[in-house]
Amino acid sequence: MKYDYKAVEAKWQKVWEDEKTFHVEIDHKKPKFYALVEFPYPSGAGLHVGHPRSYTALDVVSRKRRQNGYNVLYPMGWDAFGLPTENFAMKNHIHPAIVTKNNVDHFRSQLKALGFSFDWDREINTTDPEYYKWTQWICLQLYKHGLAYKKEMNVNWCTGCKCVLANEEVVNGVCERCGSEVVHRVKSQWMLKITAYADKLIDGLDGLDYIERVATQQKNWIGRSHGAEVNFGTTAGDTLTVYTTRCDTLFGATYMVVSPEHAMVKEWLDKGILKNADAVKAYQAEAARKSDFERSELNKEKTGVKLEGVMGINPVNDTEIPIFISDYVLSTYGTGAIMAVPAHDTRDWEFAKKFGLPIIEVVKGNTPSNLDEAAFTDVATGTLVNSGFLNGLSVTDAKKKMIDWLEANGKGCDKVNYKLRDWVFSRQRYWGEPIPMVKCEKCGWQPLPESSLPLTLPDITDFEPGPDGESPLARHKDWVKTTCPCCGGPATRETDTMPQWAGSSWYFLRYMDPHCKDAIASKEALEDWSPVDWYNGGMEHTTLHLLYSRFWHKFLYDIGAVPSPEPYQKRTAHGMILGLNPHSFVNLPAEEQEKLLKEYGSQKAAEKALEEKYGEMARHPIVKMSKSLGNVINPDEVVDQYGADTMRLYEMFMGDFEQAAPWQTSAIAGCNRFLDRVWALSDKLVEGEGYRPQIETLMHQTIKKVGADIETLKMNTAIAQLMTLVNALYDNGGATKAELETVVQLLNPFAPHMTEELWEKLGHSHDEQLAYYPWPKYEEAKCVESTVEIAVQVNGKVKARLKVAADIDAAAAIAAAKADPAVAAALEGKQLVKEIYVKGRLVNLAVKG
């Protein structure tokens, strides 16, 4: 009987929904397992094929863990506030709440059609006031503990979204969401003091099971460094403090650089000290148009202006050195001023070469260095020279001695610094959580009473941002005007809203108890489910959501609101699914290729023409999927044509889970054929109890490998092993009932619909569904082959293949080889000069004559 995937999948999805098969409650009799995937932003486009890769992988793990006897929590929800919905709503004149509901309904139906074992009773939505009540509550706690504050500051302003962006949301100088130019503006912003948790965020990684690249990216983003603050005098009578990790090179500082925004530059301009004020102001204006990323690119051309009229004074030798402003120094890192040692820093060397500044060697290596050609930056082998009391010391010892000198002479101190900046928490948009703060002329900023939460968004129709950069909420005076919770006088609400990252910074906690009225979750639920055992997501969220949520969780732990110091015990990441580039020559239809070859004479010339037309990306046959390229694959179409089980199986089989992989439609058909072969085995049952001797070893090997591979996300090799087993069953005339049952069990996490149907077909009752049926066990001793096949070569040419005992010794293997008729014929009349046995693989006989 042919497998009717549409009927079977609809049947089992209804069973799971009607019977709440995957609903979970606290059960202390079982070990808990909390699996988490990043909840999606429900866009109007619906799911793309990239979403199911992560969801399927953890669904496979969750299904196996249930069969291993775990109490599994695997939830799903919606990260539904944010700019794309608001922009769509403005364009189409629909309220964002309606857009969100429609998008969520579409996403939910798509996910259910893929057969994921989510507990839908725990579904959450960040735009639900009963959810964001607790987002607001967390923000109030941050404020009450001094971790939320308002500040006038230089901010990243997206010219497209018309709102402020966090540093992490600016990629290559443009908005990571809409791609518009990002410029700097001065605005009053709410900030969260994530820097107060910098050490905890780094140190906490040590006890976690995060893949190395995730942990490394977080450490690099936080950027903890150990160095010194050094106080340089100036000829204007001021002090310029710099932060350096190389205080050992202080004798080699030949100039200083300050950021264009440095407060001292403004002061010198105001006092008329600078003789080239016009040039300085022009450079400041130019720098203000660049993002921090553009300014700090290592390979960008170094620019700057010397400050005429003031000099710095090196504290170790009282030498006067010039001061420059340059945009490669950022006001947001360190002190906004640096000492420049061009002999031992590449950027300083490039700057010094451009402006003709002195280069003094103060660290000498074991081999001569040519400072005319490059800076010497080898810290490991360097010895101090031309450095007074540091001469002859190693770099490490010189750092310690210099810090001692600075502290003893009141010229500086040791200092730990971080690249991490505080989190810009304001957005000048409508579709976000209202910030629960009011401003009173008498009392200043005041938090709303917790009893008044949630502070809900007003139901308005005019939610376009204004050209002045104010939130659209500011125009709705009836909502803005309120009373001060402290004195009862008139006050105004904060009109900025929270960033999209707010709701996703604690959502994993709400899943534990989504209907709790009195707290983010009940104490019992938090203690039972915390922490998340396994969290999978995209690498692009490593320095955004993942860092923010760890910060919030650590804060909640510190105030006693959650029982674990870390939110996630294990973090893995999946590779992106890529698409074919329609502008690459190799992907063009044959007739189009032929046309180009005729026109340009060769493939190389045709490829060059395509590159001129479409840009550098035309070189790459495989690229990121995008609507503009028309290479986005709709999962609904795949499910309709092949079924959800085929879609799931293919996404797990398409390559190394952690690496990017190209979508190949032809390979989907191969996965579909494999499932058809498994289904057909139910019509090819052979007589016999248990596993037949000729298949028993492979059965145990497969149980072992599939189980281990699932736990290490080596899904592609697990499926390959199942394919090997199914081929072997066909080679042996079919499968016994026990053999097919094991195949069905092992395949179930990947293809749950078909396998549940086969399980029923094999005679199991409805109460014995595979969802909770015990995972098959293997015997280690039976995983070892009792016989192996060895090749027999004569002078390197294979003459025979023999089945021999796996533990056969060399003498017996060689004797068996010589006894084979084909080998004996090849040896006849020849002199045997060498015999080699490679255990379990081959016998090689060398002859002459």
Segments (PLM) and residue ranges:
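Non-catalytic terminal extensions that flank enzyme cores
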Residues: 1-46, 72, 201, 215-225, ...
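Flexible, glycine/threonine-enriched loop-and-boundary segments that flank and lead into catalytic domains
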Residues: 214-241, 290-319, 323-324, 423, ...
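Conserved oxyanion/phosphate-binding beta-strand-loop segments in alpha/beta enzyme cores
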Residues: 1-36, 66-75, 99-106, 283-324, ...
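NTP-handling and nucleic-acid-processing catalytic cores
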Residues: 3, 8-13, 49, 135-364, ...
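N-terminal catalytic cores of NTP/NDP-binding nucleotidyl/phosphoryl-transfer enzymes
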Residues: 25-94, 100, 123-138, 244-245, ...
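Long, charged, mostly alpha-helical binding arms that flank functional sites
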Residues: 3, 224-229, 237, 364, ...
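Helix-rich, typically C-terminal accessory recognition domains appended to large enzymatic cores
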Residues: 79, 144-145, 149-156, 414-443, ...
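Residue patterns forming the tRNA-binding/recognition surfaces of aminoacyl-tRNA synthetases
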Residues: 2, 18-19, 91-248, 263, ...
